[in-house]
């Protein structure tokens, strides 16, 4: 990170940190809240637990949102609804958002008995993606590749400012699911496959969103989601069933949520799917025993979209919708994204009147919801906050987005040092996504799917446009040969290569979100495979730029490419960042946050068990072992080289409650300045259950000038060596361990 960008982050941090006093979700409600609850009718209480979508009160006329006053009155006055969320079809300007939210709040405060302020909610998952003029960052999978906690926090902080400026104080983010199935269509929304990495990056994002004080006009309430096990569908499809033994659930999927609870995160969203045959929305064990009692979560639990209805219609664990409401509320949900009608409201009221749910149980949820509104400052300052509006647009935000995109880009291959390119090279820029904005942004970008090109602002640039701006005299373009359906004109494309020295092809997968992104396997698009093979016949070196939210199989085309850049979904500054890396204006430093598979049938994470590598040979029951992904977790090349000194330990034995200091010196032995990520892994050589081959325990990112060295220290304790045993207890067992840094290993003992 250069000094200029450090200065920009510092300036933004001063603005954000002005409200930096630590203020977590309140554990005890105030007398004010108790007084309100004591005066509320049952109907008013259940209304606070009801969350509807914007479509229930508004229509779109000539691309303009128009509030239906009669519907709004019905929702707010008759049914006492306390929160609304979402957009109709696409993003809105700040003024449009204000024209939506302010009338709702005005009616709520002027016409309801208790004047409980109204709360608006949104998915701002990689920036404030439903507000025009906002800054869109790389998706979480790209942010995880940066291995830069402070940068992730800064992206979250800017998102909070721009979301609050719209009048929205509740953000359905971040995703804390651990992405251990690379086929899953929401992998790009996760921070990767490792629970430590997800925990570290997730907490950084939460600190950015909430800032220690969500009453500040520059912060929002975060929502850790989707509790729990959502990212492990058995068939790789969104919202599909998962079979997760509890020992695995606790080892790999629970820690990120535990970390977020410890951080004081205000809300949580529930997994839409089911685990071991039980829908999580109906699991009292997970939502109450584990989440509330074990983890100590005090905040609001909200359903995902339509998920109580799905208990009846999809999971088929209740005969009626009313029974589904009974299951979910008794399991522990506080607020239901219904989202279209009042069936939840009506059935819940009936269940209380029938004595099947106690009113005290309703009071618990209402208490948490009102406390959330109080924490957000809604009781004191319910209307638009000018301070947030004034802070909406700053050059520093764009600089942060550019830096995040640059640091996320992962150089997977660079044969014979083809990259960086020089200004003298004549470069053909082509591929189905070279002149597209959708694939730079991916899901949740101005629309749910992010795939409506006309919705993207004119101020944003495609990769082809950046090439035209930066190197007009040496760039050659063949874009008309491609269509969005990946059809291509072979003759025209091959003709264009004749005057080129190097071919840059921008490929991967089209934008998608959630279930529409379901695929049968991770195969690369066959049309794109064909054209890469044809281009390779020209003898010109190929640079493949991958835009994708998950790792599509490139085994067949990798040999034809001299260099491969994985850009993930890099956001609004993605094209400029890709160009900067290609031409050496920025030295790539991204590290894979997942294992890049070689085959669709071999989706193994880096922290697998040794037996996962077993390959049967001729003799029965005799095995060799091999783990050969396309690229391993943590892989990422640089234009410079780094040398590691031998690992030094403060002792060869870690005793009881002591800590062990691990030191290594890293030297930039190349000619260029660069950033390096130092990752520390441990390996348990013997345990009461089969240990993982290694586990990530720490990482640090440093910047080194050519010839510069830095000493890096890690501290580990027995907790860093712990695992969940057969009794579901987290334990650290005595024995031999390895420390692994880069290609070095050193043994130590714990006793």
Regions picked out by a protein language model, each given a short descriptive name:
Residues 1-28:
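Bacterial Sec-dependent N-terminal signal peptides
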């Amino acid at each position: 990170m250069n000094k200029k960008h450090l200065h920009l982050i510092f300036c933004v941090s001063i603005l954000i940190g002005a409200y930096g006093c630590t203020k977590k979700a309140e554990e005890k409600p105030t007398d004010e809240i108790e007084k309100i609850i004591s005066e509320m009718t049952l109907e008013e209480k259940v209304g606070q637990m009801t969350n509807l979508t914007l479509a229930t009160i508004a229509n779109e006329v000539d691309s303009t949102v128009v509030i239906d006053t009669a519907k709004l009155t019905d929702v707010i006055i008759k049914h006492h609804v306390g929160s609304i969320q979402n957009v109709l079809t696409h993003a809105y300007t700040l003024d449009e958002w204000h024209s939506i939210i302010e009338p709702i709040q005005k009616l709520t405060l002027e016409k309801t008995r208790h004047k409980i302020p109204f709360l608006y909610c949104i998915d701002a998952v990689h920036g404030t993606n439903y507000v025009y003029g906002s800054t869109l960052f790389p998706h979480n999978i790209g942010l995880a590749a940066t291995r830069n906690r402070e940068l992730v926090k800064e992206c979250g902080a800017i998102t909070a400012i721009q979301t609050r400026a719209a009048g929205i104080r509740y953000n359905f983010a971040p995703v804390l699911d651990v992405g251990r199935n690379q086929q899953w269509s929401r992998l790009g929304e996760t921070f990767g496959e490792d629970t430590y990495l997800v925990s570290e990056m997730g907490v950084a994002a939460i600190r950015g969103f909430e800032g220690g004080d969500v009453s500040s006009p520059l912060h929002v309430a975060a929502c850790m989601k989707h509790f729990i096990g959502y990212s492990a569908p058995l068939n790789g499809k969104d919202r599909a069933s998962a079979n997760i033994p509890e020992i695995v659930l606790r080892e790999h999927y629970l820690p990120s949520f535990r970390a977020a609870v410890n951080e004081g995160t205000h809300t949580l969203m529930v997994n839409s799917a089911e685990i071991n045959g039980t829908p999580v929305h109906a699991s009292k064990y997970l939502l109450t025993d584990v989440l509330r009692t074990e983890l100590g979560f005090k905040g609001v639990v909200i359903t995902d979209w339509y998920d109580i209805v799905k208990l009846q219609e999809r999971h088929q664990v209740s005969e009626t919708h009313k029974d589904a409401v009974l299951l979910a509320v008794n399991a522990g949900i506080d607020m239901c994204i219904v989202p279209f009608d009042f069936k939840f409201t009506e059935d819940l009221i009936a269940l209380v009147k029938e004595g099947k749910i106690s009113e005290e149980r309703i009071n618990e949820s209402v208490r948490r919801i009102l406390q959330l509104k109080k924490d957000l400052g809604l009781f004191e300052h319910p209307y638009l906050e000018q301070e947030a509006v004034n802070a909406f647009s700053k050059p520093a935000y764009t600089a942060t987005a550019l830096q995040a995109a640059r640091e996320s880009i992962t150089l997977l291959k660079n044969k014979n040092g083809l990259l960086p390119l020089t200004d003298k090279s004549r470069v053909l820029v082509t591929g189905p996504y070279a002149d597209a904005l959708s694939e730079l942004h991916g899901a949740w970008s101005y629309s749910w799917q992010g795939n409506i090109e006309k919705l993207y602002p004119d101020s944003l640039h495609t990769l082809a446009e950046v090439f035209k701006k930066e190197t007009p005299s040496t760039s050659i373009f063949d874009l008309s040969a491609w269509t969005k359906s990946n059809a291509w004109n072979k003759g025209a494309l091959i003709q264009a290569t004749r005057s080129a020295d190097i071919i840059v092809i921008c490929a991967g997968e089209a934008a998608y979100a959630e279930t529409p992104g379901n695929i049968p396997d991770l195969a690369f698009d066959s049309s794109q495979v064909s054209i890469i093979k044809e281009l390779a016949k020209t003898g010109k070196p190929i640079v493949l730029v991958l835009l994708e939210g998950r790792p599509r199989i490139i085994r067949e085309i990798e040999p034809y490419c001299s260099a491969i850049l994985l850009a993930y979904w890099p956001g609004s500054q993605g094209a400029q960042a890709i160009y900067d890396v290609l031409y050496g204006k920025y030295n790539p430093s991204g590290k894979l946050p997942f294992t890049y598979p070689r085959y669709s049938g071999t989706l193994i994470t880096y922290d697998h068990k040794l037996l996962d590598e077993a390959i049967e040979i001729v003799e029965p029951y005799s095995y060799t072992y091999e783990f050969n992904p396309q690229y391993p977790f943590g892989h990422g090349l640089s234009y410079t080289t780094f040398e590691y000194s031998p690992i030094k330990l403060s002792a060869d034995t870690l005793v009881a409650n002591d800590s062990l200091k691990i030191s290594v010196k890293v030297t930039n032995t190349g000619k260029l300045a660069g950033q390096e990520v130092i990752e520390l892994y441990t390996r348990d050589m013997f345990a009461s259950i089969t240990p993982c081959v290694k586990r990530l325990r720490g990482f640090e990112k440093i910047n080194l000038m050519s010839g510069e060295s830095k000493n890096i220290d890690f501290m580990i304790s027995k907790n860093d060596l712990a695992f969940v045993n057969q009794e579901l207890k987290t334990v650290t067992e005595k024995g031999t361990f390895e420390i692994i840094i880069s290609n070095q290993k050193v043994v130590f003992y714990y006793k």
